[in-house]
């Protein structure tokens, strides 16, 4: 994919932190970036907070509110992986995700119009991708290899740097679970050889570990909320 920067915005929050927003679009041609004017409530990041604390995957979403006098049609798409955004705080990645598929349709009659742009995090967006074999055919692979493989399908710019696992369990006397648990990846295909989507594969791993997977910053975390009060260390 050839993602190119199309919009950016920078501002200070109430604590004087510098917030940078960048929006990219997959395009075969050359695009010129423009600056967006954000509203006072520019960014809202929401994490799933339902009653099921032990849910295997907890996703997040983001809303970016902008003011414009123009029709920003290139911010709208019917595809789930054509546009993504990054939000940084003081130069460090805070959140990234892909736009919610939608079509542009509105009339512009006022001087400034408020547009609310919706994005889903990288874990939620994995549902748009089907699992593929690591080695072009079925093989025994580690959980870590599976996770890195499915993330690489969506994260072409390698924004996700780390995978952390809560030191709640051990295998072979080590907390490095992901490199010591293996599976035949044929299990991610049905009898008709139809692949599961990558989000379901990640959920399978989280369930097997007995942990909850979530995304934050440049990392993915697996956490056992049962004993997080007693153990709060992680293996990278």
Where are each of the predicted segments found?
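Short amphipathic beta-strand/extended segments with alternating polar/hydrophobic composition
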Residues: 30-42, 95-100, 232-236
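Short beta-strand and beta-hairpin "edge-sheet" elements
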Residues: 37-38, 84-119, 211-216
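Juxtamembrane "anchor/assembly" segments of surface/extracellular structural proteins
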Residues: 1-78, 110-152
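Charged- and aromatic-enriched interaction segments used to assemble
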Residues: 108-236
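Short coil-to-beta transition motif at edge beta-strands of beta-rich domains
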Residues: 74-88
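Short, solvent-exposed secondary-structure boundary motifs
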Residues: 34, 44, 88-90, 198-206
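Short, flexible loop/turn elements at secondary-structure junctions
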Residues: 66-70, 89, 100-103, 121-123, ...
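Hydrophobic beta-strand residues in large extracellular and virion-surface proteins
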Residues: 19-23, 62-66, 83-87, 99, ...
């Amino acid at each position: 994919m050839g993602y190119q920067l199309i919009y950016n915005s920078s501002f200070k929050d109430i604590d004087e932190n510098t917030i940078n927003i960048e929006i990219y679009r997959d395009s075969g041609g050359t695009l010129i970036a423009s600056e967006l004017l954000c509203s006072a409530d520019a960014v809202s990041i929401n994490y799933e907070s339902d009653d099921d604390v032990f849910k295997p995957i907890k996703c997040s979403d983001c809303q970016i509110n902008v003011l414009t006098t123009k029709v920003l049609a290139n911010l709208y798409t019917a595809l789930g992986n054509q546009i993504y955004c990054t939000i940084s705080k003081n130069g460090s990645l805070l959140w990234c995700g892909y736009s919610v598929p939608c079509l542009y349709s509105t009339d512009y009659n006022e001087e400034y119009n408020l547009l609310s742009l919706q994005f889903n995090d990288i874990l939620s967006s994995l549902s748009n991708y089907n699992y593929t074999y690591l080695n072009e055919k079925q093989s025994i692979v580690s959980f870590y290899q599976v996770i890195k493989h499915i993330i690489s399908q969506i994260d072409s710019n390698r924004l996700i740097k780390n995978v952390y696992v809560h030191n709640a369990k051990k295998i072979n006397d080590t907390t490095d679970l992901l490199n010591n648990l293996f599976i035949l990846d044929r299990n991610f295909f049905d009898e008709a050889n139809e692949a599961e989507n990558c989000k379901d594969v990640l959920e399978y791993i989280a369930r097997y570990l007995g942990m909850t997977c979530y995304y934050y910053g440049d990392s993915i975390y697996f956490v056992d909320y049962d004993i997080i009060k007693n153990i709060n260390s992680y293996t990278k």
